[in-house]
């Protein structure tokens, strides 16, 4: 008795197996986490070091360089980049994908500690921040008021709202953006200071010495201990105003005599706006292991409580919610899943014409899908866009096995057998082929799971979810489906007219195909030559296909990045930001906007209406906005979208030019590359971050005069730094919170560089001299920022490409351009999405090779032959040819979705060959000739092949015509499978038989020899 007979003869056992699959699957569905993508750890460590008043060159040489050299020795870093601007050094260590961020952070901290003593004494301690997971926050809340100033809003958010959001389960950090923290500002009046003989460094020293936080301990007697507090620090504005800054005999100078003491802000260099209103944002970042959708819902649940407690006149609400796109995408995929189920059910009915026959695959489909959730839970996966996409494709796969069983039972019943007998024979015949097809499909996805890189990290769950569905489907097809056929099917005396009509149609197709195949096989050599030509066509089509990492998804938001004149202030940039907002807000697709503006730059996002409520998609809106924003004089604006896949940020194209040469020489090369890029027509926007156009005034100190006055360079530098630097002295406490104390010359006395020469400096003799006595001003032009990439001098050319050039061709154009214009000593590197693309390119061919190799070995073991697998796999290039034609015609691009689709296609098309070759071998073993065996096998298997192909092709039709959130990726994969399987099946029905005649094993002769 064959093992499949057990489940047919013992229906309760079969039902119990299926019930266990159902129960475990349903239990798993409720416990699986829901995310946008499979969990990956994209960690970025940012090291920020402030050195108030220092120019970029000083920052780069004395802070950035020693820190970079030490940090680079830490393990797990993919690449280091840094930016040195006035007053701040920022080093970004981008870690390797899925590298342990805690281990890397520990090493980086150790390396920083090793060089801290090399940093200037006036520099602040380096601050480390770690960003894990999404490059942008999951949600943003905006708070604004017509009555309260920014610093009052910020203080309330720090005291009340931020702690509440931080305490929400799953929130990693609630970061305030655009806030201005309270600070005690002592605005120095240089004229009053000169008249009273007070220098800025005197004020600095007095604040440091007389606002001192002391911890004196406690008294302790035999029975009583008392804590002691010394009132050495200051707490109120009035106390600061009466701070003694100079005492000359009986003459005392108080701080309020030389300065205006107010409660202001730490800095005034950032403006944040929501839909044109000045605001303060809170960015809500989700912990890496948390369920994104659950955390977002918990945040939404606490928002009403936050709103109720807001001070009168303050408004707060969620201004951006990334889970809206995720939820819409998941809803679209779930809807596609339902559509595919309905379509496949109709296809089965149209092919079989019997409601009873339809019941078997209709039950097998959802049962197999539900059972897949249990295996997903065992593997530690989540419900995400890629696993759901796998389930959509799985519908066509899981129904195949049930269709084959039903069709085979139906065929045997038409030959006069009873339902039970037909089911037993059909299950015995198909046990081997179904097992072979199941193993082959599972084997196809193994290389994807071990590919590595971003593709491997993201698509491992996709691949193994699909493999799990196939495994469950094979189990159901060999246990439940034959048993149901034996119980549901009946021995009808006469089939219905509908069934008879369908049978007549397939009889005609069967005879027509059989006759055509026999005629063509008389010249099978021609078919083989045609197959070889198609194989060559695959190589050509693949090489010429437009390639990119992933298609751009319409996420309902278009981002904006603007750069202004090199010496522009935040106020000047705000005028540009207002113009940008005015243009965008007039568009019909506009819903709301946010902007973050700082000196020389502005960043923002235009949130669009729901996908169903607008005529333009995000890409078209982006292109139109780019043209309109280009009309704004004095500012360069780039419109772009979020990367389609996680792990990268910034503009889509980021090419880095590295060298050890000077920045002046590097600028010449980068400008030459930039000019060619702009003239090429390949970019909507392109620019370089190296701009040597920032005016800088150098205070040239006359060292001889300084020495003659008995002064040192340190005294001169300290006096000027205290007046202009804007650095904080120490802290003061108000209502349980500490705030910085910052003395600085008031703005009216630092409007232009010439005013610096009128500042007074105290000499050792006590005399006050103007700075012009010992200094003069020389003007020069310097870079806005000094940038390093992998510790080398660098210029990054960033841009947004037109849709007429692929990502691969564009990066190759940039590489060739640099090669043409740059002398030796200049290298090209990549950052952001471009680096992702370069890292992933080339991996697909290796994956495909290993997939074919594994499938070949599995089939060889199954068929105990090295010839039969070649016959079966000849169908693979035929299907690839069909898919690549439509990729080259521009229906989609060669990207991670289409590449995974091509691998999937290989498994799907191989099933046809398995069905034909397996049956042909059996017929040969039964005594048929090789030619008769392959013709009959192909003819008999024609109907199940057409049925499974139609089920799969029409099952992915909802992917092909997908719209709405996340449609681009689904369309790419759907187009590949739809076209490749359709065309591949057509070729397979003729090429596989010809190949079988050419190299297939002669089982009839083998049997004769054995006898």
List where the protein language model places each region.
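Membrane-proximal extracytoplasmic
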Residues: 1-341, 383, 457, 643-645, ...
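Signature of alpha-helical transmembrane segments and their immediate interfacial
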Residues: 1-31, 430, 498-549, 606, ...
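Interfacial segments of transmembrane alpha-helices in multi-pass membrane proteins
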Residues: 2-8, 12, 287-291, 327-384, ...
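Small-residue-enriched core segments of transmembrane alpha-helices in multipass membrane transport
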Residues: 108, 346, 358-379, 447, ...
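Helix-loop junctions and hydrophobic alpha-helical segments within the transmembrane domains
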Residues: 319, 326, 330, 406, ...
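C-terminal transmembrane helical bundles of large multi-pass transporters
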Residues: 322, 388, 631-1006
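Transmembrane alpha-helices and their membrane-interface boundaries in multi-pass membrane transporters
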Residues: 395-409, 431-450, 457-499, 604, ...
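Juxtamembrane segments of multi-pass membrane proteins
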Residues: 512, 531-628, 632-639, 672
């Amino acid at each position: 008795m064959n093992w499949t007979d057990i489940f047919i003869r013992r229906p309760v056992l079969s039902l119990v197996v299926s019930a266990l699959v159902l129960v475990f699957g349903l239990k798993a569905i409720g416990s699986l986490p829901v995310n946008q993508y499979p969990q990956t750890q994209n960690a970025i460590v940012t090291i920020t070091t402030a050195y108030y008043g220092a120019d970029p060159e000083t920052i780069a040489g004395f802070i950035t360089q020693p820190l970079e050299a030490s940090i680079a020795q830490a393990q797990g870093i993919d690449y280091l980049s840094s930016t040195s601007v006035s007053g701040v050094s920022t080093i970004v260590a981008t870690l390797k994908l899925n590298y342990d961020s805690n281990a890397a952070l520990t090493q980086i901290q150790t390396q920083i500690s090793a060089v801290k003593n090399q940093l200037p004494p006036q520099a602040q301690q380096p601050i480390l921040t770690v960003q894990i997971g999404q490059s942008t926050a999951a949600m943003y809340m905006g708070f604004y008021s017509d009555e309260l100033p920014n610093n009052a809003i910020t203080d309330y958010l720090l005291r009340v709202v931020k702690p509440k959001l931080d305490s929400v389960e799953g929130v990693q950090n609630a970061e305030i953006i655009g806030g201005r923290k309270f600070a005690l500002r002592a605005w120095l009046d240089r004229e009053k200071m000169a008249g009273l003989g007070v220098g800025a460094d005197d004020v600095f020293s007095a604040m440091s010495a007389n606002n001192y936080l002391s911890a004196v301990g406690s008294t302790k007697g035999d029975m009583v201990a008392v804590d002691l507090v010394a009132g050495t620090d200051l707490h109120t504005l009035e106390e600061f105003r009466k701070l003694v800054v100079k005492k000359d005999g009986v003459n005392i100078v108080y701080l309020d005599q030389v300065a205006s003491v107010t409660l202001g802000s730490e800095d005034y260099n950032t403006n944040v706006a929501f839909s044109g209103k000045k605001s303060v944002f809170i960015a809500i970042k989700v912990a890496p292991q948390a369920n994104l959708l659950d955390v977002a819902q918990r945040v939404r649940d606490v928002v009403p409580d936050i709103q109720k407690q807001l001070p009168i006149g303050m408004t707060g609400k969620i201004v951006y919610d990334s889970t809206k796109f995720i939820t819409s995408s998941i809803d679209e995929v779930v809807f596609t899943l339902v559509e595919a189920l309905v379509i496949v059910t109709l296809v089965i009915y149209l092919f079989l014409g019997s409601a009873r026959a339809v019941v078997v695959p209709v039950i097998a489909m959802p049962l197999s899908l539900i059972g897949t959730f249990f295996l997903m839970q065992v593997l530690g996966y989540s419900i995400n866009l890629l696993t759901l996409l796998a389930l959509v494709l799985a519908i066509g796969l899981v129904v195949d096995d049930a269709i084959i069983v039903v069709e085979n039972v139906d065929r045997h019943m038409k030959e006069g057998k009873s339902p039970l007998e037909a089911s037993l024979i059909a299950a015995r015949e198909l046990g081997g082929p179904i097992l072979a097809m199941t193993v082959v499909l599972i084997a196809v996805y193994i290389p994807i799971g071990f590919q590595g890189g971003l593709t491997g990290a993201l698509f491992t769950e996709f691949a193994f979810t699909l493999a799990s569905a196939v495994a469950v489907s094979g189990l159901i097809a060999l246990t439940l489906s034959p048993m149901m056929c034996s119980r549901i099917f009946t021995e009808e005396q006469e089939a219905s007219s509908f069934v008879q009509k369908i049978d007549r149609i397939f009889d005609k197709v069967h005879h027509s195909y059989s006759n055509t195949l026999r005629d063509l096989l008389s010249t099978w050599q021609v078919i083989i030559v045609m197959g070889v030509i198609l194989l060559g066509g695959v190589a050509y089509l693949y090489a010429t296909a437009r390639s990119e990492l992933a298609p751009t998804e319409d996420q309902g938001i278009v981002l904006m990045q603007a750069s202004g004149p090199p010496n522009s202030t935040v106020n000047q940039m705000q005028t540009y930001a207002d113009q940008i907002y005015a243009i965008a807000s007039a568009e019909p697709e506009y819903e709301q906007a946010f902007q973050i503006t700082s000196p020389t730059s502005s960043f923002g996002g235009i949130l669009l209406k729901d996908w169903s409520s607008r005529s333009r998609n995000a890409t078209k809106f982006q292109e139109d906005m780019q043209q309109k924003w280009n009309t704004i004089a004095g500012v360069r604006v780039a419109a772009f979208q979020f990367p389609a896949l996680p792990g990268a940020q910034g503009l889509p194209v980021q090419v880095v030019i590295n060298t050890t040469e000077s920045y002046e020489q590097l600028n010449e090369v980068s400008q030459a590359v930039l000019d060619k890029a702009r003239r090429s027509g390949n970019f909507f926007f392109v620019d370089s971050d190296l701009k040597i156009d920032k005016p800088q005034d150098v205070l040239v100190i006359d060292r001889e005069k300084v020495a003659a006055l008995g002064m040192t360079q340190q005294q001169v530098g300290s006096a000027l730094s205290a007046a202009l630097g804007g650095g904080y002295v120490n802290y003061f406490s108000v209502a349980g919170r500490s705030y910085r104390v910052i003395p600085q010359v008031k703005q009216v006395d630092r409007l232009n560089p010439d005013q610096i020469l009128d500042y007074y400096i105290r000499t050792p003799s006590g005399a006050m001299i103007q700075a012009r006595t010992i200094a003069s001003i020389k003007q020069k032009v310097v870079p806005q920022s000094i940038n390093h990439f992998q510790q080398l001098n660098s210029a990054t050319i960033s841009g947004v490409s037109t849709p007429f050039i692929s990502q691969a061709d564009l990066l190759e154009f940039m590489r060739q351009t640099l090669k043409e214009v740059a002398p030796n000593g200049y290298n090209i590197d990549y950052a952001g999405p471009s680096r992702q693309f370069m890292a992933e390119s080339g991996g697909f061919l290796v994956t495909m090779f290993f997939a074919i190799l594994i499938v070949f070995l599995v089939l060889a073991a199954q068929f105990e032959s090295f010839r039969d697998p070649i016959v079966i796999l000849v169908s693979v290039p035929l299907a690839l040819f069909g898919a690549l034609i439509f990729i080259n015609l521009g229906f989609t691009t060669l990207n991670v979705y289409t590449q995974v689709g091509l691998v999937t296609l290989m498994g799907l098309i191989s099933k046809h060959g398995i069905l034909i070759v397996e049956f042909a071998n059996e017929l040969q073993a039964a005594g048929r000739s090789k030619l008769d065996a392959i013709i009959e096998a192909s003819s008999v298997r024609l109907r199940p092949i057409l049925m499974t192909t139609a089920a799969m092709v029409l099952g992915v039709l909802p992917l092909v015509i997908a719209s709405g959130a996340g449609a681009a990726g689904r369309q790419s994969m759907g187009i590949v499978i739809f076209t490749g399987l359709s065309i591949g099946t057509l070729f397979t029905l003729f090429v596989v038989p010809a190949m079988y005649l050419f190299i297939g094993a002669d089982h009839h002769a083998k049997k004769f020899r054995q006898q």
